[in-house]
Amino acid sequence: MTFEIVNPASLGEPRGWNNGMLAPADGRLLFIAGQVGLEPGAAEPPGFSAQFATALDRVLTVVRSAGGIPSDVGRMTVYVTDLAAYRADRVALGQAWKARFGTHYPAMALVEVKSLVDRGALVEIETTAVIGGTRP
């Protein structure tokens, strides 16, 4: 998928995301429900960075099941229950990101919420991808 990256100079240079991703006309939209990082059957929920990595894996499972690749992701909203934990784990989160997405950064938002529906969930990731468009 080849997105046209849209980063107006008046908004400053983004770090770790892009302000806009213009999809090619020949792609198909894939809307991915919020994915959490809990492991089914685990006695204890994993920590923040482990949940983030697992949530990313689940997102990519859906993308790949639709015939896509990581760079097809055009938008991502990350919901966290503890912004301080996110900030404290930024190095580990960056490593998890690069292992899965490399240097592909979609348009992103990070939102702190009081809680998530799944008990023990610290992170939930909602995503939109464009599948089947023109690729380099």
Residue ranges, per PLM feature:
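N-terminal presequence-like segments and the immediate start of the first folded domain
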Residues: 1-74, 80-136
